[in-house]
């Protein structure tokens, strides 16, 4: 827990954040918020080695809790096929899709928690400015939240923008993994809703009962 707190604090300092408001213990703080529909780029880094685990485009449907992530071919360290995931959080299912070979696996998701939605149990910590103290137009006001995922025994720190609740980054840690998820080039709409349609070769598959969750999936890519 101590290592988690130190790492989370280091991330905030590296962002050059300036404290705007006091902690939740000294104020009521904002209410839990919900992400909008989003299209953007998600980058995943393993902090214990500095390795880029994955980077690619995603679409997120906040109403139906669906996520499609397609790894970018610019991720040059990949020796195998580029990852393509369809995650259905409400159903507790995700599909590992290989469009090139028209193959697919249907697997269970252990947890609904992920990096593009503030988890239900998140507790507000502080409100911050990211950017310049003097040039207000360059500032981004963010909320920092922390919490744990009981199903995975993991802990997280999430930064979301004030107002529209865009998740900018998520730090996630367990005894075995330490990951940083960075969200960029965000548009608050799903431009291609058809990406959530299941390819025909994925239909009718038997569900594989696994211990996968959003975070462990990206740790193993």
UniProtKB/Swiss-Prot annotation:
Q: Which domain of life is it from?
A: Eukaryota
Q: Name one GO molecular function term.
A: calcium ion binding
The main location is secreted
Task: Provide one Gene Ontology biological process annotation.
Answer: cell-matrix adhesion
The post-translation modification note in this UniProt entry reads:
Binds calcium through the terminal sialic acids.
InterPro entries reported in the protein's UniProt record: Ependymin, Ependymin_CS
Keyword Magnesium on this protein? no
So which residues are the signal peptide here? Answer: 1-21
Tissue distribution of the protein: EPDs are synthesized in the meninx and secreted in the cerebrospinal fluid.
- Provide this UniProt record's keywords sorted from A to Z: Calcium, Disulfide bond, Glycoprotein, Secreted, Signal
Q: Where in the cell is it found?
A: Secreted
* Residues annotated as glycosylated: 37, 77, 101
Pfam families linked to this entry:
Ependymin
Question: Has UniProt tagged this entry with the keyword tRNA processing?
Answer: no
The terms describing its cellular component in GO are: extracellular region; lysosome
Q: How does it assemble?
A: Forms disulfide-linked dimers.
Stated role: May play a role in neural plasticity. May be involved during axon regeneration.
The record's family statement is: Belongs to the ependymin family.
Q: What is this protein called?
A: Ependymin
Which lineage ranks, top first, belong to the organism behind this chain?
Eukaryota, Metazoa, Chordata, Craniata, Vertebrata
């Amino acid at each position: 827990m101590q290592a988690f707190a130190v790492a989370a604090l280091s991330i905030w300092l590296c962002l050059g954040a300036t404290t705007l408001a006091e902690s939740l213990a000294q104020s009521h703080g904002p209410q839990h918020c919900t992400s909008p529909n989003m299209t953007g780029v998600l980058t995943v880094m393993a902090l214990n080695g500095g390795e880029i685990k994955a980077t690619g485009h995603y679409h997120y449907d906040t109403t139906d809790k669906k996520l499609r992530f397609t790894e970018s071919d610019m991720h040059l360290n990949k020796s195998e096929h580029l990852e393509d995931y369809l995650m259905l959080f409400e159903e507790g299912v995700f599909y590992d899709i290989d469009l090139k070979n028209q193959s697919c696996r249907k697997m269970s998701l252990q947890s609904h928690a992920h990096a593009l939605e503030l988890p239900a149990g998140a507790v507000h910590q502080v409100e911050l400015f990211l950017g310049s103290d003097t040039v207000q137009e360059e500032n981004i006001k963010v909320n920092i939240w922390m919490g744990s995922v009981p199903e995975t025994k993991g802990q997280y720190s999430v930064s979301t923008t004030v107002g529209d609740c865009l998740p900018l980054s998520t730090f996630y840690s367990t005894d075995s993994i330490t990951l940083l998820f960075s969200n960029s080039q965000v548009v608050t709409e799903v431009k291609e809703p058809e990406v959530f349609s299941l390819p025909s070769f994925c239909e009718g598959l038997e569900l594989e009962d696994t211990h996968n969750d959003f975070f462990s999936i990206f740790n193993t890519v």
